[in-house]
């Protein structure tokens, strides 16, 4: 079906729908209600050159829930990268020890580069300001589980749309399903022109604004993102705009929408929102486990001809 997970643009609508159906089958295994040995004896290699909490831990959980194991690193300071070992050599080494590789890197294109070097499946867990396809799949899964559909949804993407790789991937995926989108950001953090051009060329309805009030009464999903401090070239400019959008209880309490966030949040969503029925971000984070379980099982067991084709 597919050999790697590098960019959401590599997937057709039917591919995404299939993955989401497989993810739903994984939910009782993800929660621990049922146990699986589908990837028993298999090893997932982890290459994390940037910090991660949810993505890394959910991949580890996903692999272990399927009966497999995990090796790798989350701190390059403890690897030979500090001695100057190249990305390609590190990937080749890890591919010899594992059945698939998950990589997060600060450089756009890093995941696709190593997919051309190694002979095991590669999953992009975020490449700079580029793509984050597995986050997009769990975002779509969250919408599908709540609304029962993705097509025809009205989604507002709010915050750092320039450097936020999650919104880059999500915008392309929503376009495949025919959802309409509103982009809410300061001018300096607007969605890149090439993405807007691609969406409009595909016939997608796109609205741009600096004001959340312009669109909040029109949307089903409020997808909020943090300002990417680590990618911001000017610390003073970051300090000036970091609080441009702040979602609190009064923002959403009486509105028929859900609030999503790829996390971590800084101060863009008040903790008082957490207890409201509109808050979906913690559930969204959990859905990373069944979605990534589905991907790992499809990539590893089907590619390697594993005898453990069944979930259990």
UniProtKB/Swiss-Prot annotation:
Record pathway: Pyrimidine metabolism; UMP biosynthesis via de novo pathway; (S)-dihydroorotate from bicarbonate: step 2/3
Keywords assigned by UniProt, alphabetized: Pyrimidine biosynthesis, Transferase
Catalytic reactions of this protein: carbamoyl phosphate + L-aspartate = N-carbamoyl-L-aspartate + phosphate + H(+)
Residues that hold carbamoyl phosphate according to the record: 54-55, 104, 132, 135, 263-264
InterPro entries: Asp/Orn_carbamoyltranf_P-bd, Asp/Orn_carbamoylTrfase, Asp/Orn_carbamoylTrfase_sf, Asp_carbamoyltransf, Asp_carbamoyltransf_Asp/Orn-bd
Ranges in coiled-coil conformation: none
GO CC annotation, single: cytosol
Annotated Gene3D superfamilies: Aspartate/ornithine carbamoyltransferase
EC number: 2.1.3.2
Signal sequence, start to end: none
Residue positions binding L-aspartate: 83, 165, 226
HAMAP family (alphabetical): Asp_carb_tr
Family: Belongs to the aspartate/ornithine carbamoyltransferase superfamily. ATCase family.
The protein's role, per its UniProt record: Catalyzes the condensation of carbamoyl phosphate and aspartate to form carbamoyl aspartate and inorganic phosphate, the committed step in the de novo pyrimidine nucleotide biosynthesis pathway.
NCBIfam families per record: asp_carb_tr, PRK00856.1
Entry protein name: Aspartate carbamoyltransferase catalytic subunit
Organism lineage string: Archaea, Methanobacteriati, Methanobacteriota, Methanomada group, Methanobacteria
Gene expressing this chain: pyrB
